[in-house]
Amino acid sequence: MAAKDVKFNTEARNKMLKGVNILADAVKVTLGPKGRNVVLDKSFGAPRITKDGVSVAKEIELEDKFENMGAQMVKEVASRTNDEAGDGTTTATVLAQAIVREGMKSVAAGMNPMDLKRGIDLATAKVVEAIKAASRPVNDSAEVAQVGTISANGESEIGRQIAEAMQKVGNEGVITVEENKGLETETDVVEGMQFDRGYLSPYFVTNADKMIAELEDCMILLHEKKLSSLQPMVPLLEQVIQSQKPLLIIAEDVEGEALATLVVNKLRGGLKIAAVKAPGFGDRRKAMLQDIAILTGGQVISEDLGMKLESVTMDMLGTAKKISITKDETTIVDGAGEKAEIEARVAQIRTQIEETTSDYDREKLQERVAKLAGGVAVIRVGGMTEVEVKERKDRVDDALNATRAAVQEGVVVGGGVALVQAGKVLADLEGANADQTAGINIVRKAIEAPLRQIAENAGVDGAVVAGKVRESGDASFGFNAQTEEYGDMFKFGVIDPAKVVRTALEDASSVAGLLITTEAMVADKPQKDAPAGGGMPDMGGMGGMM
């Protein structure tokens, strides 16, 4: 085992604080509408330019092991906030730095670190309660756009497109962000359920120009296994022909004789029909077929449940207003499923999302929720160069996460003002002893840090701005860094999601509390380079040979 280097007390804390400051100073220049960019070097390709706090934090590794520990702990703050709220990573980093800095001063002055931490935790809980109480629900699409605009660093076009996408697919719908090949940023919306399986034969096409099969007011047969013969289905097909409605067959596969029979019937004009493979594989395929069944009000014909094709009746089929099938994908619009059943299914999948530990499974489950609940929107981000596209995509991702958070827990005044106003609840709060009260005061000072930093980045004195906001009796009074005006932040349209502000403070105080209570640090000793191998030693004369 390699030898370890151990540092104690003040020496350990100072090293750690240095690492915290290096990382936080690099991240905090991005905060606010007038925050600057950070350029990240890449081992290949062009450097990346970003204003995303967590992207900057993730790039930082320090040479000194002890300083690096401090930096990594603050990186954890940014990552946790990003995972929980999707935005607010820079705010969380600035808060963590402020709490650690003030806390270290108090520890150096001889206060008990554990009591300081208890005071910090108590104050954080009170401020979080105040933030929740001050939160108000998002009422309309204009407010959603404002949240998106603020998070995208004042680019109103991004806010507008996100609001538009959310309006179309609903709050439960999935919105994905991709890179566009062109200059423009566009939004595509797919309503209804879409899955990536196309028609099994081009003969099913109804619109030869577009090469798509369109079925209006359509019946849907969902079958779990392969169909190789249509013989068991003949009674059902006769009923479908009499009803004069089109039929879509979704099965594991339709092959050989069965497919040929369907194509011949379609070409003769007796049956409006199409067939596609079921989406997904294995257990996920079963679950997705069940989703389609609930969405369309039908049943999955499954041998596990003792159902046979011979006994299928018309009332076991699902129905949908419109189905369109291309060679690659199928879209079911306006299924006839019961709303209550769809909601119950969504709730069931949500429970699975909370319980799963796999990111891949979570993503697939979220897609299923979106397909059941509303639809899917894709925002394609454009730009002149690859570097610009990547930078904009970072901002669109942040803005999208912020708007989702706003819809979940409502909004509060932006620009760091919500924290300062919520901090007023700490004015008369006292801990069980003097050290706990000192911990409460650490939080009271630290929660002004984001407001100060936003002002500093706009070229204004942060202390003056913080003083004015603190002394104001109006809860929504603040400083608009974009226009450098004081006034009602709601009227300026400067609003933040309550969830983002809350999460940033909780994560920052949690990790900062751990840093303050650190008394010793252990790291691997740097390896000394071994000296270069010399030549072979002198072997002396070999003596005379006989």
From Swiss-Prot:
PROSITE patterns with a match to the protein in the record: CHAPERONINS_CPN60 (PS00296)
Main location: cytoplasm
Subunit structure: Forms a cylinder of 14 subunits composed of two heptameric rings stacked back-to-back. Interacts with the co-chaperonin GroES.
Keyword check for Cytoplasm: yes
Disulfide bond residue pairs: none
One GO cellular component term: cytoplasm
Disordered as annotated region, ranges: 526-546
Chain's role: Together with its co-chaperonin GroES, plays an essential role in assisting protein folding. The GroEL-GroES system forms a nano-cage that allows encapsulation of the non-native substrate proteins and provides a physical environment optimized to promote and accelerate protein folding.
Gene Ontology biological process terms, A to Z: protein refolding
Protein name, entry field: Chaperonin GroEL
Protein's gene: groEL
